[in-house]
Amino acid sequence: MLRTALTRSSRALCSGARVAAQRPIASQIFQMQAARTAAPQLRSAARWYSAEAEGEKKADEGAEQKEGETDEVAALKKQLEAKDAEAREWKDKCLRTVADFRNLQERTARDVKQAKDFAIQKFAKDLVESVDNFERALSVVPQDKLKSEEQSEHLKDLVNLYEGLKMTESILLSTLKKHGLERIEPEGEVFNPNEHEATFMAPMPDKEHNVVFHVQQKGFKLNGRVLRPAQVGVVKNK
């Protein structure tokens, strides 16, 4: 019995040794098969994680790039707005300068014309005295002698002298008019305080009120400006 028990124990130990010896090999084989099976999944997972990380990286880079572009566009817009404002300011300055220059040109041309037109004003004032003397000389000759049918030799000489003075006066007034000097003869016109100077007023029932009925001294205008007002008598019926 003892031998049988020992034999059984020895067999059990051998069998256990064989099982123990075979177990590591099977475990290794299983682990290798499991590794082979898991390797594609690991590689796929690694690729997925790598792709995801790369995608996140690209997304971050894209966001940063977009943010950088946005900042650059904003900066360019500010520069453009500043340049537009500067351009408008310079345009406004140029327009104002051009307007001021045109006004200066017009004012200068007006001043030059005025200086030219009235450069002879003092000379004209002295000249109208000579014209007045012509008129006074002509007014001395009696009109009835000029119209007389029976004329003596002396009377004919007087008429010829009168006609000569009258012609000279007419030519002188025509020449003065060419240079802007005109005589004001307001008799029968409505009184104009800008051109006439009323020296006296009198009621005259047969004439309209405020009408010039007598001229004491004729006036003159130089290029439309009154050089000397006419001295007149005015009707006053009111």
Curated annotation (Swiss-Prot):
Identification of the protein by name: GrpE protein homolog, mitochondrial
GO CC field: PAM complex, Tim23 associated import motor
GO molecular function, one term: protein homodimerization activity
Pfam family, one: GrpE
Role of this protein: Essential component of the PAM complex, a complex required for the translocation of transit peptide-containing proteins from the inner membrane into the mitochondrial matrix in an ATP-dependent manner. Seems to control the nucleotide-dependent binding of mtHSP70 (hsp70-5) to substrate proteins.
Organism: Neurospora crassa (strain ATCC 24698 / 74-OR23-1A / CBS 708.71 / DSM 1257 / FGSC 987)
Subunit structure: Component of the PAM complex, at least composed of hsp70-5/ssc1, grpe/mge1, tim44, un-4/pam16, pam17 and tim14/pam18.
PANTHER family: GRPE PROTEIN, GRPE PROTEIN HOMOLOG, MITOCHONDRIAL
Location(s), subcellular: Mitochondrion matrix
Encoding gene, per UniProt annotation: grpe
Family: Belongs to the GrpE family.
Lineage: Eukaryota, Fungi, Dikarya, Ascomycota, Pezizomycotina
Record-level GO BP terms: protein import into mitochondrial matrix; protein refolding
InterPro entries per record: GrpE, GrpE_coiled_coil, GrpE_head
UniProtKB keywords: Chaperone, Mitochondrion, Transit peptide
